[in-house]
């Protein structure tokens, strides 16, 4: 039905007859001349109906309206120089219509696809929202990413293997979506939260390099970067060290950024989990933000330096200094607003100081700020030297008297807010990093052990006896890839020993009966020569969100759910 896409026509097509199919984006009737912008997935082309060249076609064109779907045959010609539209890729040419047919008419649209619309209408009429050029670009970018994935994985010897969508209910960390069985009354399947167990079983089978692009399902509270169903680039290997996997995945991500954005990513920094939590207060820090934290708790954990706002019987005070480059510009009103904000995040107290050095001499300085009311000069000098503060900076010192709460997490929100408010973050740059050496376990609010990553993650340089002795001291062989504050990939070496996996299940409080009932087939597989294996999963939605500059993964999913897990277009669930 067509010989070319509208958005691909250029000067090389001048003089050629083309057949186009698409939707009328704009319609302009000047009597003897009618112009339409015809739109398809590749863009728009101006079409001219000239009464002096084809009177019958021009008269028929008067019936056309916006969003009619038509087929059109015409001749490509160059536009006069004074009529070239440099704002669009086809702006140097137009098509003179010879004939057309209306494939379908259109009612007036319930939303204006040339503008931004309210979120509810966009989701209700998603099939129309997707007609917007920006949405076409986002979905096409997503498709290009998937093509790169397949090409790279095949070149590296990975096999594309599908795993089941109907599987067993297992305690993987989030709630399952349950599918009742019609044939087996009273029994249920679960939609997979990830292909974790099955890809490990593939390693046991001998498929040493596996990948797939697959849907995963988690019934959890949603955020801007989460959906109840999401797409994962799932990868698993045998006989490969975690260092080698990270190197290979770095190459993979570099290729995606190069081909999609023509950007060469810089060095992938590497931090331990402990380092990023201490320095940035987050396990997914945005390294474009220059604000860094410094632990100065040791200066205040003595009776001599006890602060009036800290409980008298508390010697476990946490104190974190946070240097803000170019923060001297902040007014007292702004500072007060940040203090209020930090306390809303749970902080006990936030002090501040500005320092003006005379003639760049650090020994001659003028100090201004609330710290002078609480901190002596000697202690303050130690803090200033530790943070290497400059004249244009402001220094915040946050305090908390509850050692069971992480003060850096509280300050992380303030760090992010300051970075955005003061325009300290270079929005056009990329800051990739790896985070390694996560704790194997943590305790929840009930004092129970839970996995930091998942229950199949291998401990690092640790045997079963060491694991049992003090689980909270054990480091895992886990790693995350983070770019610009967004975790795009997470992986680990897996447990391939029956005894180690059983020990982990025991620590997590999974009874022997539940181990057999829920994981019996998997535990049996570990007895039959399971190889050392490791892997990683990337969030396709998050990668597409980053590469398109979108603020929400809904923008890169064709038919997403709302934050309440509702499809308001199809009215699901019902």
Swiss-Prot record:
Keywords: Aminoacyl-tRNA synthetase, ATP-binding, Cytoplasm, Ligase, Nucleotide-binding, Protein biosynthesis. It is found in: Cytoplasm. L-aspartate binds at residues 172, 218, 453, 494. Residues 196-199 are annotated as: Aspartate. Coiled coil: none annotated. The keyword ATP-binding applies. GO terms for biological process: aspartyl-tRNA aminoacylation. GO terms for molecular function: aspartate-tRNA ligase activity; ATP binding; nucleic acid binding. It holds the Pfam family GAD. ATP binds at residues 218-220, 227, 487, 539-542. GO terms for cellular component: cytoplasm. It catalyses: tRNA(Asp) + L-aspartate + ATP = L-aspartyl-tRNA(Asp) + AMP + diphosphate. Its EC number is 6.1.1.12. Homodimer. Belongs to the class-II aminoacyl-tRNA synthetase family. Type 1 subfamily. Catalyzes the attachment of L-aspartate to tRNA(Asp) in a two-step reaction: L-aspartate is first activated by ATP to form Asp-AMP and then transferred to the acceptor end of tRNA(Asp). This is Aspartate--tRNA ligase. The gene is aspS.
